[in-house]
Amino acid sequence: MKPDRKSLLAVFNVLFTAHGPQYWWPGDSPFEIMVGAVLTQNTAWTNVEKAIANLVNHDKLSPAGIVAARKDHLANWLRPSGYFNVKAARLKNFCRWYIEAGGFTALSKVDTQALREALLAVNGIGPETADDMLLYAFDRPVFV
């Protein structure tokens, strides 16, 4: 028997009421959490932390900062996370979409399923990354 959405949400609510928010995913802002979700693809979290620190040290940990960064500079800052050229392109794609979509405030108002579909339409955002973003950045009741 496959559980339905209503049953899963009921279980989620019982667990959430009993245990509260877990703050499992590190990050100082929802945007940083989303950047981490892109960068953690195929690498260890310690490497992601180094890449995020590089963005912070170069004052580029913002959607506009990432979009404005030269691709070769961005790739170099992301080098610790592996596949740095691919991740630089994916992160720029994501940030362009994020800005065009109106940023966190506008995206927060979008229905969960519609937001998931929009995230999946961004080149480089797959199902697990989209679900990470929904759960940890947008506080949506989804399973990863």
Report residues per predicted region.
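Catalytic cores of DNA base-excision repair glycosylases
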Residues: 2-144
